[in-house]
């Protein structure tokens, strides 16, 4: 990926701004490319993350494919001065108007579970519990996508597995993996939420993870 930039002076530093945008450290061409100007992000319990990020750049005509599928971290300064991080994956991107020197871009960001909406399937799971099925689906997606493997996982450490017995068969019928997982969780009374960071320590400004 080679992004040609128009030199009109560097974009302002985001280090002292109320909200900041970070890409994976390996995405060097994206570092400093966009300056976050406005954000509208919604987080739902037993739902997910969906946000729109409005950015400016000194580069016009950047291929939107450079953004799609890329994990990122948005950090916001709270009223106590602490930083709150939200991690997600870019699922859509648009280029807006340009005055010849500055261009505008809008990114749509969602959580990894929402990405699982892209596969619709019909299958039967035999002699598996709800937790087994969820782990199987997540493992399949993390195996087939290096991006997902590096940017999200599921934590079931606070769930008592003994409360969810093995079922003779469980049917997924013409529904996405994400909707199937949500349906199973609601049926079993399992709540979930999306949280930035993994079970191990990591710098979210270098390695977005949720």
Task: Indicate where each model-derived feature is located.
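Amphipathic alpha-helical and helix-coil boundary elements used as assembly
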Residues: 1-210
């Amino acid at each position: 990926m080679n992004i040609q930039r128009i030199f009109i002076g560097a974009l302002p530093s985001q280090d002292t701004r109320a909200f900041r945008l970070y890409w994976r450290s390996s995405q060097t061409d994206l570092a400093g490319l966009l300056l976050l100007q406005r954000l509208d992000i919604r987080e739902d319990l037993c739902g997910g993350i969906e946000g729109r990020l409005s950015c400016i750049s000194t580069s016009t005509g950047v291929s939107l494919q450079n953004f799609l599928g890329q994990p990122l971290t948005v950090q916001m300064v709270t009223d106590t001065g602490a930083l709150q991080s939200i991690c997600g994956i870019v699922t859509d991107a648009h280029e807006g108007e340009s005055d010849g020197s500055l261009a505008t871009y809008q990114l749509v960001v969602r959580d990894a579970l929402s990405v699982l909406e892209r596969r619709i399937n019909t299958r039967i799971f035999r002699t598996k519990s709800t937790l087994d099925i969820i782990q199987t689906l997540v493992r399949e997606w993390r195996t087939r996508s290096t991006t997902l493997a590096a940017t999200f996982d599921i934590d079931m450490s606070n769930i008592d597995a003994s409360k969810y017995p093995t079922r003779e068969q469980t049917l997924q019928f013409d529904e996405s993996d994400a909707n199937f997982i949500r349906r199973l969780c609601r049926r079993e009374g399992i709540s979930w939420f999306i949280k930035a960071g993994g079970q191990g320590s990591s710098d979210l400004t270098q390695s977005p993870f949720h």
